[in-house]
Amino acid sequence: MKSQFRHVALIGKYHAQGSRSALEDIAHFLGTQGCDVAIEQDTASNTGLTQFPTLDAAGIGAQCDLALVVGGDGTMLGIGRLLAQFGIPLVGINQGRLGFITDIAFEDYQDTLKPMLRGEFEEDRRWMMQAKVVRDGRCVFSATAMNDVVVNRGATAGMVELRVEVDGRFVANQRADGLIIASPTGSTAYALSAGGPLLHPSIPGWVLVPIAPHTLSNRPIVLSDAGEITVEIVAGRDASANFDMQSLATLLHGDRITVRRSEHQMRFLHPKGWSYFDTLRKKLHWNEGVA
């Protein structure tokens, strides 16, 4: 039985060692499954894979019905932000480190992908975040994020003071090294390192996690993603904001960063029988050494 996905885009972590040969092998495998393969244009130009058609993100959105990402979670997040508006499902083959969302082991990709291409998979939809920076009433920066929005102090010593509001209601002023607003997907990333909780992907919420707060009672809090969170820069030098891998290097006093749920979702496809808890056990090394 041939693939249910006729047109497949291949996106790679092209800086990784051996990426060209890995991508070429996967492309040829997809061809044997009845798929027409196109290579994302940056991947093609950086690996020299010119024997296949090349497409930019808009072209993938218009012509492909599946995107196969070979790399780590960062590679997946980068292309996923561009493709979310088109509703293209994403499958991840891990060539990074942890691989929470690029969950197919490279050495197993053929055996794992064959049934998935026939339609045997678990679909996992996750809401994105839409953020903007408002200065003197004018938007000076906007971005979408899948993992988190982070406001933090600059390279100089000293904390930042941040005023936090939810739906226009004052929550608190926080003096800290920064503040993380993380989605359930991002709760396994920087937010986890800063002491935040894990949020199951099905939870329609976010977690606010202070980074090294001066007041020890400033603890992480879980909020609904149906509202809008605003963080205002009250004090501190050289503060910056990061939206996944996108940055605004300099924030000024009075700048307001607002975060709300995006209208777009990322669609991840996992092997049949996939479990979020299996992923946590494996990636976070739970129960290792337990008989």
Swiss-Prot record:
SUPFAM superfamilies listed in its UniProt record: NAD kinase/diacylglycerol kinase-like
Active site (record annotation): 73 (proton acceptor)
Alphabetical list of PANTHER family matching this protein: NAD KINASE (PTHR20275:SF0)
Gene that this sequence comes from: nadK
Residue sites binding NAD(+) per the record: 73-74, 147-148, 175, 177, 188-193, 212, 246
GO MF terms, alphabetically ordered: ATP binding; metal ion binding; NAD binding; NAD+ kinase activity
InterPro entries: ATP-NAD_kinase_N (IPR017438), ATP-NAD_kinase_PpnK-typ_C (IPR017437), NAD/diacylglycerol_kinase_sf (IPR016064), NADK (IPR002504)
Lineage: Bacteria, Pseudomonadati, Pseudomonadota, Betaproteobacteria, Burkholderiales
Cofactor: a divalent metal cation
Gene3D superfamilies referenced in this protein's UniProt entry, alphabetically: Probable inorganic polyphosphate/atp-NAD kinase, domain 1 (3.40.50.10330), Probable inorganic polyphosphate/atp-NAD kinase, domain 2 (2.60.200.30)
Main location group: cytoplasm
Name of this protein: NAD kinase
Reactions catalysed, as given in the entry: NAD(+) + ATP = ADP + NADP(+) + H(+)
Entry annotated with the keyword Transmembrane: no
